[in-house]
Amino acid sequence: EMFSGCTALPSLDLSRLGTSQVTRMWGMFSGCSSLTSLDLSRLDASQVTNMGKMFSGCSSLSSLDLSGLHTSQVTDMGSMFSGCSSLSSLGLSGLDTSQVTDMNGMFIDCLALTALDLSGLDTSRVENMWGMFEGCSTLASLNLSGIDTSRVQDMGHMFSGCSSLASLDLSRLDTSRVAYMNGMFKGCSTLSSLDLSRLDTSQVTYMNDMFEGCSSLTSLDLSGFDTSRVRNMRGMFEGCSSLVSVTIGEKGGSIL
């Protein structure tokens, strides 16, 4: 939290900052709402394990170059870019996420992001993706093709509020360990169709508000859904004002 809450700081020179022994950068620039640019090329983060909320609330940053940031030891990236509401460009290709277990709220309320490519991210150890893209209301393109979610247990609110997404390819999403899908697609008001055939729900216990506010969906095929462990389905289809067809399978009896 070194510069946390420095709301009037317009620029920051990190070139002489000795951080070679630092293990925690949690909230380091959190709330630096006047920062318009940030050069991270000289920042030594080689020993850092926690980058949670590192840039949270940096609402004036329009772009961020992470190519020189050493993140090979980082395990926590929760809410790392949350509230970066002006961030329209974010290159993630050079980001080492091989040790990361927590990505909850990572891009929450990144209101200016129109496209995001996660194909180069190593998410093989990630267990928490709660609210990962929540509130990314202008996000029209999301590439999940290379994403590994085999260890993820929480996908609650993962795409909630992504109101500009017209399509979403979930075919590569491994949900075999996921227990939470509550609010997963809540407020995805532009989605007109959703292929859920590859979604494994055998371990899911919470589906409340899952499709709430998906006002453009006309049909849902849940024939592959196993809801035998589900405890809460409150408001699952609430506000789905265009929905005319819902298909339930043999293991989805509790939906009825």
Regions found by a protein language model. Give the residues of each.
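Negatively charged
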Residues: 1-256
